[in-house]
Amino acid sequence: MRTSFSLRWPPALLWATAIFYLSSQSRPLGRRWPSLPSTLAHVFEFAVLAALLHRALAADPRRRQRTVAPAFVLTALYAASDEVHQVFVPERTATPTEYGLDLLGALLGSSVRQWWLRRHREEEA
């Protein structure tokens, strides 16, 4: 079943806005709350974004598998822009390690979403 633009895109756009907001903070989240490791935060943020972007791009169920790569690429580009954005925020830096963690999250989110769709397609068959 196809869903409308107004139902598919807002979650991804809101999540991207939340990432931007967190990246705009002078002190990283991990420094405020040591119990939440920064490493896991990066992976989680971008895993969720990749899954939400895949959901947004996959309006037609017959084309869902073809939207995994574009969702990953869009997430990777957003992660790169997020790292560049952090260069201009006081007390923040951009590092290749953080970008790598963002990409790991994007890969994880895309993979889990693809696995989920395959599993549910097989159950329907």
What spans do the regions from the language model cover?
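"…centered on the first transmembrane helix and the immediately adjacent amphipathic helix/loop
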Residues: 1-55
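Membrane-helix interface segments
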Residues: 4-10, 36, 62-70, 95-96
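Small-polar-interrupted transmembrane alpha-helices in polytopic inner-membrane proteins
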Residues: 12-23, 68-84
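Short helix-capping/hinge motifs at transmembrane helix termini and TM-loop junctions
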Residues: 25-26, 58, 90, 117
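Interfacial helix-loop-helix junctions of multi-pass membrane proteins
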Residues: 33-36, 80-103
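Membrane-interfacial alpha-helical segments at the cytosolic side of multi-pass membrane proteins
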Residues: 45-60, 104-117
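Short, charged juxtamembrane terminal tails flanking transmembrane helices
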Residues: 120-125
